Amino acid sequence: MELWRQCTHWLIQCRVLPPSHRVTWDGAQVCELAQALRDGVLLCQLLNNLLPHAINLREVNLRPQMSQFLCLKNIRTFLSTCCEKFGLKRSELFEAFDLFDVQDFGKVIYTLSALSWTPIAQNRGIMPFPTEEESVGDEDIYSGLSDQIDDTVEEDEDLYDCVENEEAEGDEIYEDLMRSEPVSMPPKMTEYDKRCCCLREIQQTEEKYTDTLGSIQQHFLKPLQRFLKPQDIEIIFINIEDLLRVHTHFLKEMKEALGTPGAANLYQVFIKYKERFLVYGRYCSQVESASKHLDRVAAAREDVQMKLEECSQRANNGRFTLRDLLMVPMQRVLKYHLLLQELVKHTQEAMEKENLRLALDAMRDLAQCVNEVKRDNETLRQITNFQLSIENLDQSLAHYGRPKIDGELKITSVERRSKMDRYAFLLDKALLICKRRGDSYDLKDFVNLHSFQVRDDSSGDRDNKKWSHMFLLIEDQGAQGYELFFKTRELKKKWMEQFEMAISNIYPENATANGHDFQMFSFEETTSCKACQMLLRGTFYQGYRCHRCRASAHKECLGRVPPCGRHGQDFPGTMKKDKLHRRAQDKKRNELGLPKMEVFQEYYGLPPPPGAIGPFLRLNPGDIVELTKAEAEQNWWEGRNTSTNEIGWFPCNRVKPYVHGPPQDLSVHLWYAGPMERAGAESILANRSDGTFLVRQRVKDAAEFAISIKYNVEVKHIKIMTAEGLYRITEKKAFRGLTELVEFYQQNSLKDCFKSLDTTLQFPFKEPEKRTISRPAVGSTKYFGTAKARYDFCARDRSELSLKEGDIIKILNKKGQQGWWRGEIYGRVGWFPANYVEEDYSEYC
């Protein structure tokens, strides 16, 4: 058996790889094992499986999303622990880039083999590899792995189901505290009986939880005040006394509501206390630091350690330490929506059920808010790691939003035209361009994205050579610009998507709707959205605030916020007049039949137009420009780029007279179907793979064309508009020929034109159907029912899934991130907040 397959078998025995992972399938390749390991997460989990607590998983980024910085940090944590706790020699270890870039995967296998032979690993009763009888020689298969990895699209999220859930330990403590004596149940329970059980559980667990808070105050906080400084007490106990006060009143009102017939007013108590429970925001954001501080204080002072043991003995006979109990409030606040969900399920009366749903929504919203505080704490740790690794950085990265992506690229700038090797960190509001020096980074340029925009350049994609895939980052005024080059087309696509997402976070759709001026904002206090009344989530840049009236909103709610109270009343009318004026100008230009020029040399604003004659006009080779002002003796002309509809000034030496060429022979293309009706296209594409397309001549009008494409199991039709000798499917971009249009959308997603159509033109219909090796039944993509979106949700980066109210989502995973589920819709896969959907239990499979 090949050595890498022996390694795979060993990793399965160590409970790191699931037995059904695709690396075990017939026809599996070694690159699939490399891809599974290269972010370092499973390697760190491996060490913990062999030696419990060998690595503190809080120091490992469990969702690195292939961030090179975070993956390398995880890998180096694994390597250092192999030395320190497993006794491996330095000579037995691979280098971090041997795995991440798969420069020497044979050395990675060698290290794992050495690890399997250590006494610690063998004590687990797992057979090491290779055994003496088995052959080792499979070095040849490791060559070229780096190129194969470059073509790998996404990591396998199901892998992380094998990683320890850091919440599990706290959950066990909570369940232990809340456990009650079993009550005898009737042999056959009615829905009424089940509802009574739910109500009893809500009351009993609230009583026990309030007692636990009282015990923390009485048996730990007060006795320790004589041993610790006031600042230590505040750091360790945070606002636990505020929690106790709130829950004492909450329990009193809950009991009163439960004492009324049918507990009809219980829902009002939960809705009323949603706002008071916002004190959990502070507690949950600081509890991890509190636990670490407690550990440091106890380790430094033996008298404190002894006092803590004494307090624990008095509080609960030593069953739970203070560190254990500090995790309970976070667990409790995340349980209310689960308790109410069960109560709703067993409530029959329609009005009661509807009222309880309001309470359930309130507690789901609260739970999501708490989960986002935890997620943002992880994000801030990630930002801190970036900050500490970048030299010459004199400002806080947290002011520039959440990290989007990081990695190696090549770059040219206006000042320096030769390609430079660089490492870049992209955040919501900034791009950091650095030079890597070992494990640290030297900041070379800090780009504030507020004044930049992204423009694709697909010229390098045709060659498909390494480092030829490029797009441009251009300053609005044209004084500065960068060309960013990427190793593969897929990497370029990922980076471009994240740039577009970052810029859409800075300038979101509907930012100026209803007279507002919404900007990304970090709210110090927990705040509700003006439109939907739900909480803004997290600890920083939770949403948007209007610069004028201070209204707060989610990104997805900006268009629904009531009109701005601080803005002039003529705003809507002014907008309407401007739009009508632009339409009149467009009509006038068409009537005049202005001369057209063809661009043969690009222009991105350098040199800028002289003086203040007007904005520059971006030009790409092949664009058609309609002249609006042009004199032969002048060097600068004004025109409209018909590809983008932008108007501006450009040097006249970048264009030549446009000559309309002879009609193209389309029959040579595998995608051209000739004259065809919609029904004919649907018949051809019905049994083809998603992404298969054809271009047809419309039967009713031979001068017009349409694209038909199979997407999300349906056939969609897109009209191609023809005017002025140009072809377009949207007003944003025009092409000189049908071939150029098709080639562009073979490389660029149609979602820029149609939001629900996130696909490229992938497979011409005349190409033979390429069937990939089918997965075994055990490995087939399974989903755990469906859910219906109750609200809009706007993704903040490419790992998230945007939703529209009413969307039906296939649920793929509920385990990854607390409060977030992974799902699929319209062929797109990503994470979305669980409280934004209503699950359809009838479709569970």
From Swiss-Prot:
Q: What modifications follow translation? A: Phosphorylated on tyrosine residues by HCK in response to IFNG and bacterial lipopolysaccharide (LPS). Phosphorylated by FYN.
**Keyword rRNA-binding carried by entry:** no
Xref: Gene3D superfamilies: 3.30.60.20, Calponin-like domain, Dbl homology (DH) domain, Pleckstrin-homology domain (PH domain)/Phosphotyrosine-binding domain (PTB), SH2 domain, SH3 Domains
Sorted alphabetically, which SUPFAM superfamilies does this protein's record hold?
Answer: Calponin-homology domain, CH-domain, DBL homology domain (DH-domain), PH domain-like, SH2 domain, SH3-domain
Q: Which residues form the SH3 domain?
A: 592-660, 782-842
UniProt-reported outcome of changing residue 696 to L: Loss of interaction with SYK
User: What GO cellular-component annotations does this UniProt entry give?
Assistant: cell-cell junction; cytoplasm; cytosol; plasma membrane
| Described purpose of this protein according to its UniProt entry | Couples tyrosine kinase signals with the activation of the Rho/Rac GTPases, thus leading to cell differentiation and/or proliferation.
PANTHER family named among the record's database cross-references:
PROTEIN VAV (PTHR45818), PROTO-ONCOGENE VAV (PTHR45818:SF2)
This chain belongs to the protein called Proto-oncogene vav
Species of the source: Homo sapiens
Classification from the root reads:
Eukaryota, Metazoa, Chordata, Craniata, Vertebrata
